[in-house]
Amino acid sequence: MSRRGTAEEKTAKSDPIYRNRLVNMLVNRILKHGKKSLAYQIIYRAVKKIQQKTETNPLSVLRQAIRGVTPDIAVKARRVGGSTHQVPIEIGSTQGKALAIRWLLAASRKRPGRNMAFKLSSELMDAAKGSGDAIRKKEETHRMAEANRAFAHFR
């Protein structure tokens, strides 16, 4: 048995303007090459665009988008007896949110458009409505888990 203690789970900090942890998680995932101020700029411009287009609280649109994209179940490759099976596993809320944010950013990067703030705002609004690439990715993951339900006992 290891003598080393377990690491304490860090609490997610909130961003300076909206005091929201989801915004901070989004900023940390969009971050490239340590340019955090640029990441904040992109997020805040995207939030402003959402507010202009929907004329509602942009944070509620963000929450709704992330809630819509968050998967309940995913598949994990597990090697059993020489063959690899895709085993469906349940996902916790924190890991689900992290996956949702990753999928939203990947989908917005793929979009054609002017700049990242525009693409991110469009993807967030689409996800809040229940469409877009990120929602498609979630549905695809759920379909994979459903198709491989027979291997659930390998968990």
UniProtKB/Swiss-Prot annotation:
Name of one Pfam family that matches: Ribosomal_S7
InterPro entries found in the cross-reference section: Ribosomal_uS7, Ribosomal_uS7_bac/org-type, Ribosomal_uS7_CS, Ribosomal_uS7_dom, Ribosomal_uS7_dom_sf
A Gene Ontology biological process term: translation
UniProt xrefs under SUPFAM superfamilies: Ribosomal protein S7
GO cellular component, one term: small ribosomal subunit
Description of how the protein assembles with itself and partners: Part of the 30S ribosomal subunit.
Primary gene name: rps7
Domain of life: Eukaryota
Family recorded in the similarity comment: Belongs to the universal ribosomal protein uS7 family.
Protein name as catalogued: Small ribosomal subunit protein uS7c
Single GO MF descriptor: rRNA binding
Keywords linked to the UniProt accession: Chloroplast, Plastid, Ribonucleoprotein, Ribosomal protein, RNA-binding, rRNA-binding
Statement: the UniProt record of this protein carries the keyword Secreted: no
Location in the cell: Plastid, Chloroplast
Function according to Swiss-Prot or TrEMBL: One of the primary rRNA binding proteins, it binds directly to 16S rRNA where it nucleates assembly of the head domain of the 30S subunit.
